[in-house]
Amino acid sequence: QSEIIEDRIKEWTMFDSTGYTLPAIPTIPGTIVPFDDPSRILDIGVNNYFTCQNAINTLRATGFVQDSWRFESGNTKFILNGGIRFHYWSFNNEFTASPRIALRILPNWKRDWSFGIKTGVFYQSPFYREMRRPDGTLNSNIKSQYSYQILGSSEYNFKMWKRPFKFTTEVYYKHLENLVSYSLDNLRITYSGENDARGYATGIDMKLSGEFIDGLESWVSLSIMKTAEDLYNDFYYTPEGELVRPGYIRRPSDQRFAFNIFFQDHVPGFRPIRV
């Protein structure tokens, strides 16, 4: 895969207030400021403007090897999937290998249950905005973010109202390394451009899906998650001069609860149209 990226940035920062912009030339409080007063003139300043121009031409090569095995023990069936994924990126001459394995267990129970466990190493090569620093320069030494993951799951298939339904549950833990930290300001995302943090994510996902309306699949899900990161070498001093290292702090993507519904129905009297 070939990637060609051209990037041009000219960025200004302006803080707007009532009748003037910040930073502004101070005036005496309570005085009337004429419209032609210098305090009403935009003063961008050196720290509120930057420009840059970047162009990169890189190559990526990916590949994988995977196999599957099926076996039985007593009345229980097992499906084992294993493999490894390879990735090379010419921008930083980085080669990664990601081994993964997944086991699915199908017990011969009266009720239709299945269980699974997955683990592996997952690499995520940085995309362009992650390797661009806040000042517009590119980090040619940036490395892929990666995680060690383990996930346990269960699946229950059943009938309700004589229609098929499925209830799934997943519990996971992910240890994150080489993170590229970022800040979120409304819709604006600013990446540090450095592998400057480690972190973790853990949670549980539950989903009920099925034909609430005959012939149409709908679903409802509930997720609980906690994710935090520890910035390398971050610290501050209290007014008393005491050194404080914050340790793990909440990531911008931390979302403790998420509840989602997707529901379909037919238009009364004309079933081909769905809502």
Region spans (language model):
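Extracellular loop and loop/strand-boundary signature of outer-membrane beta-barrel proteins
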Residues: 47-54, 85-90, 134-141, 189-195, ...
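Membrane-embedded beta-barrel scaffold of Gram-negative outer-membrane proteins
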Residues: 108, 144-211, 223, 228-229
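Flexible, solvent-exposed coil segments and beta strand-coil junctions
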Residues: 38-48, 77-84, 127-137, 181-190, ...
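Gram-negative outer-membrane beta-barrel transporters
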Residues: 70-77, 173-175, 195-274
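Outer-membrane beta-barrel transmembrane domain signature of Gram-negative proteins
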Residues: 1-77, 202
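Outer-membrane beta-barrel translocator domains and adjoining extracellular loop/strand segments
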Residues: 7-15, 92-98, 128-135, 179-188, ...
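Transmembrane beta-barrel outer-membrane domains
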Residues: 54-60, 92-96, 141-147, 187-189, ...
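Structural signature of Gram-negative outer-membrane beta-barrels, strongest in the C-terminal barrel
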Residues: 3, 50-174, 264
